[in-house]
């Protein structure tokens, strides 16, 4: 799996709203602040106790959601949203599914362009920087993203109502609200203080922090926090280098891959459109994930 790609998720969400049934998006808040809030969700665990060298994410809920049980978690969320009959909850299901598709498509690309000197964190950060700089016309390494997306760092009661029961049923975890409160507070702190350094002083300080304190296994290294000042164009694959993606050899540039992801997300949105529009029809869902659910008819 790849590192946090919340910025990329955000832009793809914006470009994918047109694939969602208009009855679901009608009168729903799809502002930049809301989209970035949901763009954070899939990788929220990356921010849990992010600058605490002594505590790690022992719950790993975010990581578990992204694992083999993802289809079962998503199905529970879909069922919850359908029964609650709340368009906001249905829309959240789309964002969760989109995030999954993005990671599935981006993982082979990031692995292909990672090297010993340019690890996955560096590649992911470069990708985020490229799309932010391109779309916003400002430099991400100088931008306080906590201010830029000022109202994006808290899940509301509707959000918790959607994910709480599915997380209990699929993963047996009973503290979803507190877990995601900690994650989103960590995200706010990260984007407010840790992700940029206008003077460059944080880079050596992070190196010292990692060397003396940050030794916990699976704990994110502070040296990966900063966005790069310059875009490494080799990661954009402008030379059309071939790489393997899901057993197929491809040579997409980063921008071409973005368009391919949109095509895949359109398919994913059709799956949810069919489910919510046709009385919980799971045929498309089962076909997409190659699964078979013995669904009991809801009263």
Predicted regions and their residues:
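N-terminal leader/auxiliary helical segments
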Residues: 1-94, 98-299
């Amino acid at each position: 799996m790849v590192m946090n790609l919340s910025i990329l998720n955000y832009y793809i969400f914006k470009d994918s709203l047109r694939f969602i049934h208009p009855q679901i998006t009608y009168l729903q808040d799809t502002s930049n602040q809301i989209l970035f809030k949901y763009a954070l969700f899939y990788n929220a665990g990356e921010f849990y106790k992010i600058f605490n060298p002594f505590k790690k994410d022992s719950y790993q809920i975010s990581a578990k959601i992204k694992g083999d049980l993802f289809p079962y978690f998503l199905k529970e969320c879909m069922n919850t949203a359908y029964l609650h009959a709340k368009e906001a909850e249905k829309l959240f299901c789309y964002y969760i599914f989109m995030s999954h598709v993005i990671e599935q498509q981006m993982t082979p690309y990031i692995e292909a362009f990672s090297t010993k000197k340019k690890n996955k964190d560096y590649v992911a950060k470069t990708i985020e920087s490229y799309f932010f700089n391109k779309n916003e016309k400002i430099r991400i390494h100088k931008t306080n993203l906590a201010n830029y997306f000022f109202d994006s760092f808290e899940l509301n009661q509707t959000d918790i109502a959607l994910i709480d029961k599915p997380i209990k049923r699929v993963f047996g975890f009973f503290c979803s609200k507190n877990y995601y409160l900690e994650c989103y507070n960590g995200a706010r702190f990260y984007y407010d203080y840790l992700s940029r350094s206008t003077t460059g002083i944080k880079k050596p300080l992070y190196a010292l922090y990692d060397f003396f304190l940050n030794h916990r296994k699976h704990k994110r290294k502070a040296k990966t926090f900063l966005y790069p000042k310059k875009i490494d164009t080799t990661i954009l694959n402008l030379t059309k280098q071939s790489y393997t993606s899901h057993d197929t050899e491809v040579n997409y540039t980063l921008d071409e891959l973005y368009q391919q992801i949109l095509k895949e997300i359109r398919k994913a949105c059709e799956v949810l459109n069919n489910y919510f529009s046709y009385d919980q029809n799971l045929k498309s869902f089962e076909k997409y994930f190659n699964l078979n659910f013995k669904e009991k008819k809801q009263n």
